[in-house]
Curated annotation (Swiss-Prot):
A Pfam family of this chain: tRNA_anti_2
Protein name stated in the entry: Exodeoxyribonuclease 7 large subunit
Lineage: Bacteria, Pseudomonadati, Pseudomonadota, Gammaproteobacteria, Enterobacterales
Reaction catalysed by this enzyme: Exonucleolytic cleavage in either 5'- to 3'- or 3'- to 5'-direction to yield nucleoside 5'-phosphates
GO cellular component: a single term: cytoplasm
Assembly and interaction partners: Heterooligomer composed of large and small subunits.
InterPro entries the UniProt entry points to: Exonuc_VII_L, Exonuc_VII_lsu_C, OB-fold_nuc-bd_dom
Described function: Bidirectionally degrades single-stranded DNA into large acid-insoluble oligonucleotides, which are then degraded further into small acid-soluble oligonucleotides.
GO biological process, alphabetically ordered: DNA catabolic process
Domain of life: Bacteria
Length: 462
């Protein structure tokens, strides 16, 4: 066996390093569409997962500095589109992807956008039950906003015609798929609100993929539904399909056919209701007529009882009875009064008042005489006592003193002058005499010496 040249002999480390360099230089950055599995996130914050398809798989890592830029949380089984560099982990000889960016692939991206819009509108309160408008019962005219060529319109019309053929229907044709569909749906809703032709709207389409139904996840459509004054029933896809329009609408129907069922009246049911109401009406009329007949019979009986001849006869009987009772009562009263009169007459005869009256008159005359004598004597005594009092009063009156030549002087303050201490030279005095006042000036004062009282005699000298 011939040995190779030394340069062609590789160690495992050299081999792995060479392969890594070749992969990194030749492949560079690549885009890969795959499904995520075995996703883990240890305490370091890095993401480790496997990317696979139906035939193969490869390990991948996304470091914390890069995965913080990802706007969603990767889930097991989620389809993603990643940009990565391919490398080889030299210690084990495993080759793997170092992911630099990641985004949902296909429906995954749409689902992410759906969830973001759902969270946004929910936070604004657009899904709240208080904003839901009640549907008219029954609907008088229905508007349908959908494709004029779609199966959904065909199903809706068939059910409405079968259930309630007389119900008017207005169709607002729009695209329900593609870039132009959202604005056409918005314009149709606004047009229906301006015309005010319908009292309820069905907005929807048949089934399809998430991308096919995407017009009903458009924010413009959602806000147009919320702003509508006409109640809106959403009918998008199949029962398992859920769109933003379903959350905003006043009522969600699982399918377009179900929407037609919900807002229309069943002709057979209406007939049954009509028959039931007719029976109830007939029963009510029978009951009403029977009640009125009984009332009429009672009134007739009462009228017979209140006939003028009967009333007059009853009143005559009452009058005769009352008259008899009155005569009897009067006779009884008259007899009673006659008996009382007889008894009083007897008592009066036994108690003649004339002698007593004469005695009382004499007693009265005596009392009058005695009263007059007593009054005369009392007046005489009072007059005598009054004269004595007047004489005494006259004797002590200051005016009487003045008439005897005396006078009364007052100092300037109005006090009566009693002694020389009250005045001094130059003071003015007012002096009262019998017939008036005299004003004078003090020229001089002179005090009279007090008389000395004689000493009392002793008992021995008597």
């Amino acid at each position: 066996m011939t040995l190779p040249i030394n340069n062609n002999i590789f160690t495992v480390s050299r081999l792995n390093k060479t392969v890594r360099q070749l992969l990194e230089m030749e492949m560079g950055r690549i885009w890969i569409s795959a499904e995520i599995s075995n996703f883990t996130q240890p305490a370091s914050g890095h993401w480790y997962f496997t990317l696979k398809d139906t035939h193969a798989q490869i390990r991948a890592a996304m470091f914390r500095g890069q995965n913080t830029k990802v706007t969603f949380r990767p889930q097991h089984g989620q389809q993603v589109l990643v940009r990565a560099t391919i490398t080889l982990y030299e210690p084990r000889g495993d080759y793997q992807l170092i992911v630099e960016s990641m985004q949902p692939a296909g429906d995954g991206l749409l689902q992410q956008q759906f969830e973001l819009l759902k969270q946004k509108l929910s936070a604004e309160g657009l899904f709240d039950a208080l904003h839901k408008k009640p549907l008219p019962t029954p609907a008088k005219q229905i508007g349908v906003i959908t494709s004029s060529t779609g199966a959904a319109l065909h199903d809706i019309l068939n059910i409405l015609r079968r259930r309630d053929p007389s119900l008017p229907i207005i169709i607002y044709p729009t695209a329900v798929q593609g870039a132009e569909a959202p604005m056409q749906i918005v314009h149709a809703i606004e047009l229906a609100n301006r015309r005010k032709e319908c009292d309820v709207l069905i907005v929807g389409r048949g089934g399809g993929s998430l991308e096919d139904l995407w017009a009903f996840n458009d924010e413009r459509v959602a806000r147009a539904i919320f702003a509508s004054d006409i109640p809106i029933v959403s009918a998008v896809g199949h029962e398992t399909d859920v769109t933003i329009a379903d959350f905003i609408a006043d009522l969600r129907a699982p399918t377009p056919s179900a929407a037609a069922e919900l807002i229309s009246r069943n002709k057979l049911e209406l007939l049954r209701q009509l028959q039931s109401q007719q029976q109830r009406l007939e029963m009510a009329m029978d009951y009403y007529l029977a009640k009125k007949l009984r009332a009429l019979t009672q009134l007739h009986h009462r009228l017979q009882q209140q006939h003028p001849h009967l009333r007059l006869a009853r009143q005559q009987n009452v009058l005769a009875t009352t008259k008899q009772r009155l005569v009897t009562s009067f006779q009884r009263l008259l007899q009673t009064k006659q008996n009382q009169h007889t008894q009083l007459q007897k008592r009066l005869n036994y108690q003649e008042p004339s002698p007593q009256i004469q005695a009382l008159l004499r007693q009265q005359q005596q009392l009058i005489y005695r009263m007059r004598e007593s009054i005369s004597q009392q007046l005489a005594r009072q007059r005598e006592q009054f004269a004595i009092s007047c004489s005494r009063l006259e004797s002590v009156s200051p005016l009487a003193t003045l008439s005897r030549g005396y006078s009364i002087s007052e100092v300037a303050s109005g006090d009566v002058l009693k002694n020389t201490k009250q005045v001094k030279k130059g003071d003015t005095l007012k002096t009262r005499v019998e017939d008036g006042w005299i004003t004078s000036e003090v020229i001089n004062t002179q005090k009279i010496p007090a008389k000395r009282k004689p000493a009392p005699k002793s008992k021995s000298s008597i």
